Amino acid sequence: IKLSRIFGFEIIDQSNFYIPTSNKDGLKNPSQIGKESLIIPMGKTEITRPVKSLDIILRTCASVNMLTQTKKRIFEKDKSEYSLKTLNSITNSINNNKELFNKIHLKVTIIDHNSNQEILSKFNEILKNQFFQSEVLKLDLDLYSKQIDKINEEGKEVSKNQISNMSNIHQSFEIAKNCGDLIYFVEDDYIHKLDAIEEMIFAYERISSQLNRELILCPSDYPYLYNSLEKSYVFLGNKYHWRSIEETLCTFLTSKTLINKYFNEFTSTSKKEHYPFEKPFHNIYKKELCISPMPALA
């Protein structure tokens, strides 16, 4: 064991995957946040880009069923059900690894527009007595709607629902400018797996350290991205594989560094309705690496 440590090797007991050189259970997560990524059988990757903090910004509007469509949502439930389940899934995913989030600063912020008091009370009830910081903010619609071109890229009038959505996106980017490190922008119709947040943090550290660059992570593996033949790079995260993509919707994780670098491009989605809506994001992904998990985390 002493010789293995000197030469940087790990010993694994094949009968139970115990790692005596590190005194770890290989069946659990042997990686150490901010220090090393340990993947069986690939070995150790030193973390040169540690995650210092994570801000999760959830945009909610429990009163609007579908933003730009008239059809019903899957399962045909009230929109508030999707908003509440999204928040519940995020808090459950965070609590799935409290040890990880005790080592980095974590905050959950909700920017809400037009949800009734009953739903807001339920948001606060879910966030009450959690070990991480949280707050529920009201969308400043008057401030941000003034900055929106009311005629979209197709020459049509922008709908009221879209104006509130674009304003919410703008406010979330303004908040992100004052965050510490990573920011996860989330729409209120994504149900997260228990290991979703943990995987995104460990994958970001590992892949960013290997490539020596900042990243954009999308938690979903969108089926529509398989409709065309495109080259894709595949990376090993913590427990999932990740592949490079050039399109996302408005739910993604990235760093404050990239937000500041492309702030005008990011906020252009909240000033002009493009087609597709996320086109400015896609232009950024032509210059920066965006990856998504296989299979999806949310």
Language-model features: locations:
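Phosphate/oxyanion-binding active-site loops and adjacent basic polyanion-contact surfaces
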Residues: 76-87, 160-169, 192-196, 273
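C-terminal catalytic/acceptor-binding lobe
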Residues: 18-30, 256-298
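Conserved catalytic core of nucleotide-sugar-dependent glycosyltransferases
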Residues: 149-152, 162, 176, 182, ...
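Active-site-proximal specificity loops/subdomain of glycosyltransferases
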Residues: 112-180
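Alpha-helix termini
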Residues: 93-103, 129, 175, 204-212
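N-proximal low-complexity "stem/linker" segments adjacent to membrane-targeting elements
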Residues: 2-92, 99-101
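Short loop/turn segments at strand-loop or loop-helix junctions that form parts
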Residues: 54-69, 112-113, 136-146, 219-222, ...
